[in-house]
Amino acid sequence: KENMSLAVPAIMPIDKKLLRGHIGAYGMRFHPKLHIWRPHKGIDLGGTIGDPIYATGNGTVKEVEITRSRRGYGTQIVIDHEFGYQTRYAHLDKVWVKEGDKIVRGQRIADLGNTGISTGPHLHYEVMYMGHHVNPINYINKNMSAEEFEDIISSARETTYEAD
């Protein structure tokens, strides 16, 4: 039971004091580069290139893709947290882990970047449960007060940081 509570994604992947701009919301939105409506499968957290990115739960690094391509997610990490959970951290600059690494919640795994289809430095963060995308905003309140969580919720709105 303790293993599961540490594996479930439950903290902000970036220090909330480093957030810049609004949070790009989960769900349908207008793609800022393709100019079409499509699902946004995660949230966008704006920051500065080089800001530390942290694992949101214990797990194993399933995938690391390092690229400077201006396509898709750019440089990204996928972590398997077991118990049906996976997380994706995309548009990264530097990666501090490799495939197969065991990681713990709060461990620095990467630096925020601007790779892939992106209109500014930010982290695109996804939570998947049993193979389906779920709204990450519901998984980030473990390390904040109710008031801080309400501030995050109220700032989550459509943005043009990226286009997945």
Spans of features found by a protein language model:
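Solvent-exposed coil/turn segments that connect beta secondary-structure elements
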Residues: 27, 50, 58, 66-67, ...
